[in-house]
Design a protein with these regions (language model features):
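ATP/NTP phosphate-donor binding region
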Residues: 1-67, 74, 78, 115-119
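Short, active-site-adjacent cap segments at secondary-structure transitions
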Residues: 72-74, 103
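Catalytic core of DAGKc-family lipid kinases
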Residues: 34, 43, 81-138
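Gly/Ser-rich catalytic serine loop of serine hydrolases
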Residues: 69-70, 99
Length: 138
């Protein structure tokens, strides 16, 4: 079976102090069972997730799954917006938190264990969440 280019999983292997790279084979298997086939891309440096997300959306991806921590999720979210407009208004974001904090996941009441969160993606419902922009200058 070919890779589903409509779903792109963007992975930060350094999340969770490098733990994500170690557990990735298990995460990949769980995601295959819960969401079906997908294309996965691993980031290699800071800022990668934003550019990889934007590129995937511009190439027709309709679902991006972020696998990493809160910082990685922030980068992926930034890839959805360009010039204060959505890159693809029909695209959806899912996430599987494997970082050390996972504050965003906790705030939405999503299970802390990645295994449970991956299982929940089977019946995930799309919810619209407002996006804000904060700029800090000194």
């Amino acid at each position: 079976m070919g890779k589903n280019l409509k779903t792109v999983v963007i992975v930060n292997p350094l999340a969770g102090n490098g733990r994500t790279a170690k557990i990735w084979p298990n995460v990949e298997s769980a995601l295959n069972q819960s969401i079906g086939s997908f294309k996965s891309i691993h980031t290699t440096c800071r800022g990668d997730a934003k550019h990889l997300t934007r590129q995937a959306l511009e190439n027709g991806a309709v679902r991006i799954v972020a696998v990493g921590g809160d910082g990685h999720l922030n980068e992926v979210l930034n890839g959805f917006i360009e010039n204060d407009l959505p890159v693809s208004s029909d695209a959806a974001l899912s996430f599987l938190m494997t970082g050390t904090g996972c504050d965003f996941q906790r705030s939405l009441g999503i299970p802390a264990k990645w295994q449970s969160a991956a299982e929940n993606l089977k019946q995930a419902q799309v919810r619209q969440i407002d996006v804000g922009k904060v700029t800090f200058t000194t």
